[in-house]
C-alpha cells in the first residue's frame, strides 16, 4: 500500500449530531478525554469555576452554553487518527450542520434517554439519509430516569426508519444504574461516577457469570438482567457491518457522558468499525482517497477565530493525496494557482501549523475574501466536489446602524460573517439597504453580538418586506436582461455576486415565475458553481 492509502486507512472522520441539550458537547469533551486529547473536560454548566467546554470557544457560546459554530478537533487513538467535527447544537444553525455532514464519513447521534427521538434529530437524520451516512447511536443521560430501553429502540426504528443493533445494554437507570453489558464481548462495565472531570476506567467483569458480580449489583437485578437480555437478543438485530456502513443499521450504546460512563466501549467500537475516507463525487469523475494527487473542498468558513488577528479561516476537507506545507494548488473556481502556506490543524480553538495532512483530515486555510464555501483545491485538475448547497433563508432583516459613520465596517462585517454560511447577505439593486437572511431568529442575535464584539459596530435588525429568496439563472442573456429590467425592484446580489429574486410574498414569487418561463428560480445554490465578487 502507498503512504496515501495507509494514512487514509488510519483516518476516522465523523460528526456528532443531536437535538439541543441531549448532551452532545459534553460527549464531545469525553471522547477527547478518553482519546487523551485533553486532561480535564470542561463542564459547559460549570460557570463559577470558569470552565467552558473545549469545543465551545466563541465568547457568545460560552455565555449561552450552546454550540453555534462547528469546531474541528483531531486526536490519535489506538493507532488511528480521529477527526471529530462538532456541529451547532441550536436548530437555527442547521445549514452549517448540513455542510459539516458533507465533510465526514460517518456520524454519531446522541439521544436523551428521557426525551427519546426529538424534532431536530429527525431533521438531521434526513440529511444523513441523503448521503447514506453510517450512524452510531449513543443514548445519553443514563444516570437519570428515562424511557424503557426497549421502547427507545422501537422509537428509533419507527420514527427514524433505521434498524437498531444494541451493542451495550443498561443495567438499571437513574438511581438504580449499575452499569452496562457489552452484548458482543459479554463484558460487564460497572458504573462509577466520573469525578473532577478526569478519565476513570470502570470496573469490568468478563461476563455475567463472573465471580463477585452478583455482590456488586445484587442477585435480584442480575436475574432481571438475564431475563431482559434474553428478550432483547431475541427481538433485536445483531450488528451487521455492511448494513451499518450502508446507512441501514445503527449500533446503539447506552451511557452517561457527564459521568464518563459508557464512552470507552463506544470509542473502541467506533475505531474498529467506522469507515475510513470514502470515494467522493465531483463534476467530472469520482475521486478515490488513495489517489496520490491532493484534492479537497471547503465546507466552512469562520471569521475572527483569533480576535487579535481579525482572521478568516476556510476549513478544507482533504479528499485525496497528501497536503504538505507551502504546496502549490489550483483554486478551481478562480482558475488561479494558490500557495497553501501556514495551513492549520485544530484542537477546538487551539491551532497548530499543519506540516502535512492526509485524506479525511481537515485543515484551515487563511482566507482573505477569495475563498467561498464549496470551493475545490487540486494539484492542477479542473474538477469540483458536488453536493454542498446554500439554502434560501426563511427570515429576512434590514441592518440599521446606530452610528451612520460605521457603514463601511458594517458592510465588511456582514460580508465576512455571511461567508461562514449561517447567514446570507443581500444588496438590493435599487436601494442601499443591507439585508440579512437566516433560517432562525437566533442567527440575527449572533450577528448583532459579533458585529459589536468583533467589528465595533452597533447595529439593529428590523423587519423588511422580503418573505423568501430564489437564485435566478437563464441561459439566454437577452431574456435575463429583460427580466432584470422588469423586476429590478425585487432583485438583489448575494455575497458571491449571484442574482437573487427577493420576493415580498409567495404569491409575488409565483407570478414572477409564471411571467418568466425561461428563467430558473432555485431555492438552493450549489457552492461549487458560485462566482466570487472581485
From Swiss-Prot:
Occurrences of domain tr-type G (ranges): 9-278
Gene3D superfamilies according to UniProt: P-loop containing nucleotide triphosphate hydrolases, Peptide chain release factor 3, domain III
Cell compartments where the protein resides: Cytoplasm
Highest taxon in the source lineage: Bacteria
Cellular component aspect of the GO annotation: cytosol
Keyword Nucleotide-binding part of the UniProt annotation: yes
Main location (coarse class): cytoplasm
Entry keywords, A to Z: Cytoplasm, GTP-binding, Nucleotide-binding, Protein biosynthesis
Pfam families with a match to the protein in the record: EF-G_D2, GTP_EFTU, RF3_C
Keyword Nucleotide-binding: yes
GO function terms (MF aspect): GTP binding; GTPase activity; guanosine tetraphosphate binding; translation release factor activity, codon nonspecific; translation release factor activity, codon specific
InterPro entries (alphabetical): EF-G-like_DII, EFG_III/V, G_TR_CS, P-loop_NTPase, PrfC, RF3_C, RF3_dom_3_sf, RF3_GTP-bd
Membrane-spanning residues: none
Biological process according to GO: regulation of translational termination
Binding site for GTP: 18-25, 86-90, 140-143
Function (record text): Increases the formation of ribosomal termination complexes and stimulates activities of RF-1 and RF-2. It binds guanine nucleotides and has strong preference for UGA stop codons. It may interact directly with the ribosome. The stimulation of RF-1 and RF-2 is significantly reduced by GTP and GDP, but not by GMP.
Family to which the UniProt record says this protein belongs: Belongs to the TRAFAC class translation factor GTPase superfamily. Classic translation factor GTPase family. PrfC subfamily.
Alphabetical list of HAMAP family matching this protein: Rel_fac_3 (MF_00072)
Protein name per the record: Peptide chain release factor 3
Organism: Xanthomonas oryzae pv. oryzae (strain MAFF 311018)
Biological classification of the source: Bacteria, Pseudomonadati, Pseudomonadota, Gammaproteobacteria, Lysobacterales
